[in-house]
Amino acid sequence: MEALGGYPTKPSASRAGLIKVLLSVAVCMGSLYLLQSKLSKSQKAKDFYSYEVKDARGRTASLEFSFKWFNIICEVSLVVNVASGRELTEQNYRALQELHRERGTSHFNVLAFPCSQYGDTESGTSREIEAFDKSYYGVTLPIFSKIKIMGSEAEPAFRFITDSIQRIPKWTFWKFLVSPEGQVVRFWKPEEPIDDIRKEATALVRNIILKKRQEL
């Protein structure tokens, strides 16, 4: 009689091979999914509102949705690279706060992004910057996490803005008006009057309101 002890080896080896194949397939599928997600995200990021940003507390949210903790919806946005310790700070913050208060938060918002790449202008943490600006300048507009806007570590959302205008801000408080479609339509340097911005922003908001009335 032939010994049967060696026979179970083949099925066991075959089963182990099948498991390896299945694991390999699962890994490949997972890798493909991650790659597709990254590609989809990069393809989607064709406008400012396609990006994600962080607030001063480090919480992440997509710009295309409302910021629940700020109670805002991004439709028309004035994006500003701000700083707390410069000679233009108080003048610009007062003007931006006034504009933010005038237009409300239903269709228009001022979005402030602190940046410390222009000398020692923002040495504190994001939360310290937010607390200081609110207490000292009385701002209620949303202040986001401190970012870089120059170099390889530039914030992607801000890089979209600078790529759109083919210019890098030379100093703080450059202001960029973003349409409801997420495109940069105009920009202003820090010394330019806020009235020019007010006119452009009001025109965009008026178009939004008229369009919504027509859709009713």
State what each model feature region is.
Residues 19-34:
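Hydrophobic membrane-insertion alpha-helices, especially the h-region
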Residues 127-172:
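Short, internal strand/loop/helix patches
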